[in-house]
């Protein structure tokens, strides 16, 4: 089986990661103790991707949980699915990273990293044919960002040919947790460009907007945000967990979505958007789902796809529906909005259908887009970074942990390069190539 090893780090990573497991257990009919409640072949057919079968028929998530302080771990353990994880797979320190990337990457995190790698190795040895890793973390804090990227680079060294997928929560302009977020995010981004294969970009501001605007929640909690994220994560991974026709593993996903190796930051969207505990009264049609999921208001990160162009995209539908109708709708979107797709990658939207809908819905769709407009996020973080880095504000917290200013400068220029690469492909037209097909296509 093509197993995926799940790793969650830091407070944010552990919270969205645990929520993800609640959703996945539910979809595969596994109760909080790891016992199977369902007799359905579809649910159990590819159960080994995320679960290891232990003695007595218990299914244990292939999950590694790490943090530099015990708090979040304790709440995961006492949470609804706390008993399902392997107790040895909780690895935590006592000191915390104090929102300092350098503590996570160089000092506190570096002391704990070997024990994390031991558990990762043990889990990897349990796999027949490991296809890759997925990491949940945020980029604004210290542990998920600093130690998360340290772990990613160590795994990259040890398993160079396995896929590395991340669910990365970027800091948001309006919803700020700490003042040094731009530093932490830029230092992490620098690492993710080099060491990750595919990054699903999430951010709290976009999630808050969805809660306010679409779900009409007046005071959304992190629980509501995590509900949205876990729905999206479940949608992104459903083609890996259930039998399906298209995008059935992490590598196929990457091949379909990544035209240039550095441009692997994806926007994700989900439809229909529902709030926690609500009942869906009306089944949406395939055209409605398609329209909703391409809507810029449905994107889980604060960048507007209308400000850029799609290099590639992938749409995953779930539920009983006709694949022909799905293909027609996707084609329809491309024809109607052709200026938002680069014309030099023909047929750049892939669609897939998985028969099992998520709990409580009869159909749903998940969207993954590689859009040049994601540069808005990097540009925003980089402006905040530069504003603080010029006067060297807060820098002593990082140099005090042994970091060099040079590393800041390198990270800054790597992120600026990334932004200009996105811009370059956004502006590129088919004309610039030296081919002549007799007709001469028109650029914009």
From Swiss-Prot:
Required co-factors: Mg(2+)
Listed A to Z, the keywords are: Cytoplasm, Cytoskeleton, GTP-binding, Magnesium, Metal-binding, Microtubule, Nucleotide-binding
The cross-references to InterPro entries, in alphabetical order and at most eight, read: Beta-tubulin_BS, Beta_tubulin, Tub_FtsZ_C, Tubulin, Tubulin/FtsZ-like_C, Tubulin/FtsZ_2-layer-sand-dom, Tubulin/FtsZ_GTPase_sf, Tubulin_C
Instruction: Answer whether the UniProt record assigns the keyword Iron to this protein.
Output: no
Q: Composition bias, kind Acidic residues: at what positions?
A: 429-444
Tissues in which the UniProt entry reports expression: Found in areas of rapidly dividing tissues.
- Its name, as the record gives it, is Tubulin beta-2 chain
Q: Which organism is it from?
A: Daucus carota (Wild carrot)
């Amino acid at each position: 089986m093509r197993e995926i090893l799940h790793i969650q780090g830091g407070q944010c990573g552990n919270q969205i990661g645990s929520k993800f497991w609640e959703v996945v257990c539910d979809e595969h009919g596994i109760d909080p103790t790891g016992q199977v409640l369902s007799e359905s072949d579809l649910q159990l057919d590819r159960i080994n991707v995320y679960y290891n079968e232990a003695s007595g028929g218990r299914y244990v998530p292939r999950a590694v949980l790490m943090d530099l302080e015990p708090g979040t771990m304790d709440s995961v353990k006492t949470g609804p699915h706390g008993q399902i994880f392997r107790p040895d797979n909780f690895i935590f320190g006592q000191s915390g990273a104090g929102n300092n990337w350098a503590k996570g990457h160089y000092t506190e995190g570096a002391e704990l990293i070997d024990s994390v790698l031991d558990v990762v190795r043990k889990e990897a040895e349990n796999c027949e044919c490991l296809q890759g890793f997925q990491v949940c973390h945020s980029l604004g804090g210290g542990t998920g960002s600093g130690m998360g990227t340290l772990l990613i680079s160590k795994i990259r060294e040890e398993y160079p040919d396995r896929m590395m997928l991340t669910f990365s929560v970027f800091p948001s302009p309006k919803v700020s947790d700490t003042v040094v977020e731009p530093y932490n995010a830029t230092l992490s981004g620098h690492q993710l460009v080099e060491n990750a294969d595919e990054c699903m970009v999430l951010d709290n501001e976009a999630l808050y907007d969805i809660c306010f605007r679409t779900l009409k929640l007046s005071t959304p909690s992190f629980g509501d945000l995590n509900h949205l994220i876990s729905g999206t994560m479940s949608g992104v991974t459903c083609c890996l967990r259930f039998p399906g026709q298209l995008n059935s593993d992490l590598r196929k996903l990457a091949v379909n979505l990544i035209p240039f190796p550095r441009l692997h930051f994806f926007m994700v969207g989900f439809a229909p958007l529902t709030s926690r505990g609500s009942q869906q009264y009306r089944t949406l049609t395939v055209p409605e789902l398609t329209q909703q999921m391409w809507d810029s208001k449905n994107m889980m990160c604060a960048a507007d796809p209308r400000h850029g162009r799609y290099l590639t995209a992938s749409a995953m539908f779930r539920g009983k529906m006709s694949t022909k109708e799905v293909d027609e709708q996707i084609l329809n979107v491309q024809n109607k909005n052709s200026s938002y797709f680069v014309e030099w990658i023909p047929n750049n939207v892939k669609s897939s259908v998985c028969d099992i809908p998520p709990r409580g819905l009869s159909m749903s769709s998940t969207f993954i887009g590689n859009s040049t407009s994601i540069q808005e996020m990097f540009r925003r973080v980089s402006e905040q970074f530069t504003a603080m880095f010029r006067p060297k504000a807060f820098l002593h917290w990082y140099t005090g942990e042994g970091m060099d200013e040079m590393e800041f400068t390198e990270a800054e220029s790597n992120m600026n390069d990334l932004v200009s690469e996105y811009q370059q492909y956004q502006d590129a037209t088919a004309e610039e190539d030296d081919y002549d097909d007799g007709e001469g296509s028109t650029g914009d």
